[in-house]
From Swiss-Prot:
SUPFAM superfamilies: Class I glutamine amidotransferase-like (SSF52317), P-loop containing nucleoside triphosphate hydrolases (SSF52540). This is Cobyrinate a,c-diamide synthase. Belongs to the CobB/CbiA family. Keywords: ATP-binding, Cobalamin biosynthesis, Glutamine amidotransferase, Ligase, Magnesium, Methanogenesis, Nucleotide-binding. It comes from Methanococcus maripaludis (strain C7 / ATCC BAA-1331). Coiled coil: none annotated. Comprises of two domains. The C-terminal domain contains the binding site for glutamine and catalyzes the hydrolysis of this substrate to glutamate and ammonia. The N-terminal domain is anticipated to bind ATP, and cobyrinate or Ni-sirohydrochlorin, and catalyzes the ultimate synthesis of the diamide product. The ammonia produced via the glutaminase domain is probably translocated to the adjacent domain via a molecular tunnel, where it reacts with an activated intermediate.
Length: 447
């Protein structure tokens, strides 16, 4: 299986722009499977638009090595090449002492060649030192190439090439991207702006990234390097092991999916469908009522940006308030379930108020334990998740929580998963993944 990892020397070096551009350029002649290392929701939306294949997350905190390999094989088996965008710097993970949660960890697990991406502003000889340092830090990694971003011009590139080749004649110089503010992408408090808000503008930007990559990088060299990757196999003893719990049901799950709610892992949807669920997508912003279903799934997103329009859609609010099935709200979905977001009236199904703050309220990988059976898990079972939010809940008049947070923050006092309506409604800040919480899809899909 051809595969390549695009890894940064740090955050903010242009990983998403250039990785997406590479995916777009390769997609003109290849069936490309995109991946994002880490728990991010937003970068995969760019990958998906560039390749027309759903981008998947690979994460060595949520997943063990066998699960990473199994998931990779599941999605890459019929593809020509897989392009894997890293997270932060190559070696950044959850600890300064190991590589769990890092790009390096996933690259080693998949025996994937790595192309190092660096911001080359004001660098010449130091670029060689950076490359040598990254290569020698962990010799199990297969760092095969380098891309220079934000170069000043041809003279700058020539000096970079001379310096790097003088000290490391084996590294492949894939090319260089010039400084151009037009190539940058908007930022918002959770990272990059999600795509549904400006679809046409985004498609034009992705075309620009793809064209720039074709002009400035050696695409054939990227394919050549990926072709040299080592093969690997899933342990035969575990080849029938499922990645998540499966209990066949015939439930209908209504999934909120629009500009305000779009933070979802596609593998969660796959897991729900494997559990027999039929997914129905709807828009809390634009539709008048929730579709016929057994369960409503309100994912994360930016409801605070659209709070006025959400509040004004009274028919949808009434439809959800009168719904007599199960409702799960996650982060942004939790906020929508409360009485209000920054004073704008919401569903009033959880007695608390959501407010935005200027500072991050929760940013962490999460470990938790279910205190009871609930609509997304089973009592005493442990799970791994992720949280990243600038909002917090105040005036909390609920005291029933479904899970305890052992690593991370949660809603209050290390508790998360506020439960109401006799357990039929659960709202939490922890973003659940069907492998980090293998009971998630089966529990949510129950009738």
């Amino acid at each position: 299986m051809k595969r390549i990892v695009i890894a940064g020397t740090s955050s903010m070096v242009g990983k998403t722009t250039i990785s997406t551009g590479i995916m777009k350029a390769l997609s003109k002649k290849n069936n490309v499977q995109p991946y994002k290392i880490g728990p991010d929701y937003i970068d995969p939306t760019y990958h998906t638009e560039a390749t027309e294949n759903k981008s998947r997350n690979l994460d060595s905190f949520f997943m063990d090595k066998l699960q990473i390999r199994s998931l990779f094989k599941k999605h890459s088996k019929n593809k020509d090449i897989s392009v894997i965008e890293g997270v932060r710097g190559l070696y950044e993970g959850i600890s300064p002492y190991n590589d769990i949660g890092s790009t390096a960890s996933v690259a080693k697990t998949l025996n994937a060649p790595v192309i190092l991406l660096m911001d080359a502003r004001s660098l010449t000889r130091s670029a060689a030192a950076i490359i040598k340092g990254f290569k020698s830090f962990d010799t199990e990694l297969n760092i095969k190439g380098v891309i220079f971003n934000k170069i000043r011009g041809e003279g700058h590139l020539n000096k970079l090439k001379e310096a790097v080749k003088y000290y490391d004649n084996e590294i492949e110089i894939i090319g260089a991207i010039p400084r151009d503010e037009g190539l940058s992408v908007s930022q918002r408090h959770l990272g990059l702006v999600p795509t549904p808000e400006n679809k046409q503008g985004l498609l034009e930007r992705i075309d620009l990234w793809g064209n720039t990559v074709e002009e400035c990088l050696d695409i054939e060299k990227i394919v050549e390097l990926s072709d040299k990757s080592f093969d690997f196999c899933v342990d035969e003893k575990n080849k029938d092991e499922t990645l998540w719990k499966v209990e066949k049901n015939n439930s209908k799950i209504a999934v909120a999916f629009d500009e305000s709610f779009n933070f979802y892992y596609w593998d969660n949807f796959d897991a729900m469908e494997e559990n027999g669920a039929k997914l129905k997508f709807f828009s809390p912003l634009n539709d008048s009522e929730v579709p016929d279903c057994d369960t409503i799934y309100l994912g994360g997103g930016y409801p605070e940006i659209f709070s006025e329009k959400l509040s004004e859609n009274k028919s949808m609010i009434d439809s959800i308030r009168n719904f007599d099935g199960k409702i799960y709200g996650e982060c942004g979905g939790l906020m929508y379930l409360t009485n209000s977001i920054d004073g704008k009236e919401m569903l009033k199904l959880i007695d608390a108020n959501a407010v935005m703050t200027p500072n991050v309220q929760g940013l962490s990988y999460v470990k938790g334990t279910f205190e009871k059976d609930c609509i997304i898990g089973e009592k005493s079972k442990e799970f791994k998740a992720h949280e990243f939010h600038y909002s917090k809940l105040i005036n909390i008049n609920e005291n029933d929580f479904s899970y305890r947070i052992n690593r991370g923050k949660g809603i209050i006092n290390s508790m998360d998963g506020i439960t109401s309506k006799g357990g039929d409604i659960v709202g939490g800040y922890a973003h659940q993944h069907c492998i980090g919480n293998p009971y998630f899809a089966a529990s949510l899909s129950k009738i």
